[in-house]
Amino acid sequence: AENEKIKIDFNLEQQKTNDLSKDKQALNEKITGAAVLKAYKITALAYKSKGVEKEKETDKAARTDKIKVCFTVSENKLVSSGYKRFFVRIARPDNVILTRGPAYTFQFLGQTLQFSAMETLNYEGDAADVCTYFEHPVNGAEMVKGKYFVNIFTEDREIGQTTFELK
């Protein structure tokens, strides 16, 4: 009888251990899912350079030679600290990606994508402001009139997007 009780107790404890393991795995999956960065307060503005260190905001495609993209990276204490690279892709209305050349690529979910600008941030878990520029190369794809799409990526995730219009 005592031997039977020990078997029952053992089976109950084994079931508790299995349940705890499942709970732990579910929590780890939730933490992993929550340990992501997000971008907010995203702005994209077109500029015309006016000499050294001077620029003027414009909404005209023909005058644009620089696009400034700014965003705030969310606070998230679950994300590991360290240097994070943020890739900005700017697509013209015809879906041509603005880039400075064929070497401007990054890996995203197993694909090689072109980027327009990249910025590195030493992320420490706190919200942080990031600004980066796409400077239009002399021989690059022309700026055209219409709606441009801006997407921001880091660590195999798209973390934000916005649009802007040039006339």
Regions found by a protein language model. Give the residues of each.
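Membrane-proximal structural modules of membrane-associated proteins and complexes
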Residues: 4-167
